[in-house]
Structure formats: structure tokens, C-alpha cells
């Protein structure tokens, strides 16, 4: 600002002016009092001049002061505009200085608040771009690896399927084996029990656990002689060891109800030997092998009693020569008078 003032002092216009009252009369603005004094002086001189001189003096006395006043006003306006320009430049400088001050204060507060923030922004932007490029490259590599692994897995699966197909073609068909508990073996009606009777005689021997389990899980296990549990059961002499194992596995099914056991016994009556249209009891064929009194329930029918049943505490029990429970007894007609009265 001082430089501008120095320039203004050195490069002043030709017409110098001052707004103060004590300025030089040459630069003083004209006024109406001055014009009136001049008019009086002109009137005094005009008395001695002619008409032409009066007109010329009038133009000089009236127009020239006004023109001078106009020129002084224009010069004053020019100076005022110049000073206004200086004021505007000073305000612009002040604005720049104030903006710089505010920017410095904000930068200082930013550095104080965020001390960990980076200051080199250009390097940070370059590093961010490099990180993005590396991440994209990593994703591409991961995709390629996954595609390669899928291809290898597919090849292995196809190779395994081909090997299985070849093995299935070369392998012969094996008939499925069913367990003995799921297969029922049927015997013909005319089949006779051709096995030799196994007699124990007077020597009492203890059987193994399988025989004991067979005694407790037979068709008539709901009636059991507690005194003869340990002895062998010979009334079912046609039952082999394999059928005993089957009976053990199917014991739960046969224990559902007494009716099921009776139906099974009736259905298996074809295995008994038949002589002269009469069912022969296996207990009669092998009387010495009879152990349990509860191994089978027999129906009481009218007929002669050939043998007596031994006591419960005897070493062995013999079966009466009655018809087997596996067969249906022949009904004999009775007279009405022999029936018992209704109760």
C-alpha cells in the first residue's frame, strides 16, 4: 500500500487540486460570490466600453467560471475513484491474509486432532492404487486355482466311475443269502422222521445253554414244569439243532399269544408220522426222552388210558397215548340225555 501511495505522489496529474480551504487560489474552486464581484467590476468597466465589448465580457464572466468548476469536479471525482481503487486493493489483500490465517488455523487444528493421519497425500493415493491392483490379481489367481481343482476332481470322479463300471461288468452276480430266521423250510406231508432216537436212559445229563433256552422258548413255554428244567426235551424229537436256533430267534414272535402258538402247532402237524389214519405221538415213540410236562397241551378225549403219567418229582415223565395236539380229534356223537345240565 505504501508503494501505491509513492507511485501516486510521483505520477500526479498536471492539474493539482486540494480540498482544503487554505489552498492556493489557482486551485481553489469557483463560487457565486466571486462571480458577483466580477460582475460588479465588469459593470463598472462596461460603463466606459461599447456594446460589443459588454457582450464579450458577459460570456467570459458567466461561462468561464462554470467551465472551471466542472473541470475541478471531474478532477475531484477522478481522485476519489483512484482512492476507492486503493481501498478495494487493500481489502483484497486483507481477505487473502485473513484466508491464509484461517487456513493455517484449520491445518493446525487438523494436525492436533488427527495426529496419526498421513500428510503425503500423493504417495498414499499411489499406494492405494497398487493395493487395488494386487487385490484384483489375487482374486484372478484364486479363480484360476479353483477352476483347476474342479477340473482335477471331475477327472478323478470320471475315472472312478469308469473303474466301477468295469468292475461291475467283470464281477459275477452273487445270489443274496438270507439268514435262517427269514427263510421257512417246508417239509412234505409224507415225510417220515427217519432220525434215530437219542435215548438218555437212566443216566441224567445236563444239557447246554441252547437246549435250556429251547425248553424255555418252545411252543408250549407258557406251561413249564419247574422240576424238569435241566433235563433234555425229547417229546419234540424231530426238532434238530438248527431248528432250535430258529426257534430261539423267533421266540418273541411265537410268544405273542396262546392262539398263535396253537395255530402254529396245528399248521405243523404234517410233520408227524401217520400210521393207519392215526396220528402217532412222538412222545409215545420215545417214552424215555420225555422230560417236561408243559412241553405240549393235549386235548382230553374219550378213550382208554394205556399208560399212567409219572409224578412231577420223578426223574422223567411219560406222555399218555392220547391224540396229538397237532391233529383234530374225532368227535363222537353223544346222546342228549348224557349232556350236563345248563348252569
Swiss-Prot record:
The modification Phosphoserine is found at residues 20, 31, 257, 265, 292. PANTHER family: DASH COMPLEX SUBUNIT DAM1. Residues 207-217 have a biased composition (Acidic residues). This is DASH complex subunit DAM1. One of its GO terms (biological process) is mitotic sister chromatid biorientation. Residues 125-158 form a coiled coil. The modification N-acetylserine is found at residue 2. It comes from Saccharomyces cerevisiae (strain ATCC 204508 / S288c). Residues 167-183 have a biased composition (Polar residues). Component of the DASH complex that connects microtubules with kinetochores and couples microtubule depolymerisation to chromosome movement; it is involved in retrieving kinetochores to the spindle poles before their re-orientation on the spindle in early mitosis and allows microtubule depolymerization to pull chromosomes apart and resist detachment during anaphase. Keywords: Acetylation, Cell cycle, Cell division, Centromere, Chromosome, Chromosome partition, Coiled coil, Cytoplasm, Cytoskeleton, Kinetochore, Microtubule, Mitosis, Nucleus, Phosphoprotein. GO terms for cellular component: cytoplasm; DASH complex; mitotic spindle; mitotic spindle polar microtubule; mitotic spindle pole body. Changing residue 111 to Y: In DAM1-1; produces abnormal spindles resulting in growth arrest at 34 degrees Celsius. GO terms for molecular function: identical protein binding; microtubule binding. Belongs to the DASH complex DAM1 family. It comes from the Eukaryota. Its main location: nucleus. Component of the DASH complex consisting of ASK1, DAD1, DAD2, DAD3, DAD4, DAM1, DUO1, HSK3, SPC19 and SPC34, with a stoichiometry of one copy of each subunit per complex. Multiple DASH complexes oligomerize to form a ring that encircles spindle microtubules and organizes the rod-like NDC80 complexes of the outer kinetochore. DASH complex oligomerization strengthens microtubule attachments. Within the complex, DAM1 and DUO1 may form the microtubule connections. On cytoplasmic microtubules, DASH complexes appear to form patches instead of rings. InterPro entries: DASH_Dam1 (IPR013962). Residues 316-336 have a biased composition (Basic and acidic residues). It is found in: Nucleus; Cytoplasm, Cytoskeleton, Spindle; Chromosome, Centromere, Kinetochore. Residues 1-35, 150-219, 302-343 are annotated as: Disordered.
Amino acid at each position: 500500500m505504501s508503494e501505491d501511495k509513492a507511485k501516486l505522489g510521483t505520477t500526479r496529474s498536471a492539474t493539482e487540486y486540494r480540498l482544503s480551504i487554505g489552498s492556493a487560489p489557482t486551485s481553489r474552486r469557483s463560487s457565486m460570490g466571486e462571480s458577483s464581484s466580477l460582475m460588479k467590476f465588469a459593470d463598472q468597466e462596461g460603463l466606459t466600453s461599447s456594446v460589443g465589448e459588454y457582450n464579450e465580457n458577459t460570456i467570459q464572466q458567466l461561462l468561464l467560471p462554470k467551465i472551471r468548476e466542472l473541470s475541478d469536479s471531474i478532477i475531484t471525482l477522478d481522485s476519489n475513484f483512484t482512492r476507492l481503487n486503493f481501498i478495494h486493493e487493500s481489502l483484497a489483500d486483507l481477505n487473502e491474509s485473513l484466508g491464509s490465517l484461517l487456513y493455517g488455523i484449520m491445518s493446525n487444528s487438523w494436525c492436533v486432532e488427527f495426529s496419526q493421519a498421513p500428510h503425503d497425500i500423493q504417495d498414499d493415493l499411489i499406494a492405494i492404487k497398487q493395493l487395488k491392483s494386487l487385490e484384483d490379481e489375487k482374486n484372478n489367481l484364486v479363480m484360476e486355482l479353483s477352476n483347476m481343482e474342479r477340473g482335477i476332481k471331475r477327472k478323478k470322479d470320471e475315472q472312478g466311475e469308469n473303474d466301477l463300471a468295469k468292475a461291475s461288468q467283470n464281477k459275477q452276480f452273487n445270489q443274496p443269502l438270507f439268514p435262517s430266521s427269514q427263510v421257512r423250510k417246508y417239509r412234505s406231508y409224507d415225510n417220515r422222521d427217519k432220525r434215530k432216537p437219542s435215548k438218555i436212559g437212566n443216566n441224567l445229563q445236563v444239557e447246554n445253554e441252547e437246549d435250556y433256552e429251547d425248553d424255555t422258548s418252545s411252543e408250549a413255554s407258557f406251561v413249564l414244569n419247574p422240576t424238569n428244567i435241566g433235563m433234555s426235551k425229547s417229546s419234540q424229537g424231530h426238532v434238530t439243532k438248527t431248528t432250535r436256533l430258529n426257534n430261539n430267534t423267533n421266540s418273541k414272535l411265537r410268544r405273542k399269544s396262546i392262539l398263535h402258538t396253537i395255530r402254529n402247532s396245528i399248521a405243523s402237524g404234517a410233520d408227524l408220522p401217520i400210521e393207519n389214519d392215526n396220528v402217532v405221538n412222538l412222545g409215545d415213540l420215545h417214552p424215555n426222552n420225555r422230560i417236561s410236562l408243559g412241553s405240549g397241551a393235549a386235548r382230553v378225549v374219550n378213550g382208554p388210558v394205556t399208560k399212567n403219567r409219572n409224578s412231577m418229582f420223578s426223574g422223567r415223565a411219560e406222555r399218555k397215548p392220547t391224540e396229538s395236539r397237532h391233529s383234530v380229534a374225532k368227535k363222537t356223537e353223544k346222546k342228549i340225555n348224557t349232556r350236563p345240565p345248563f348252569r
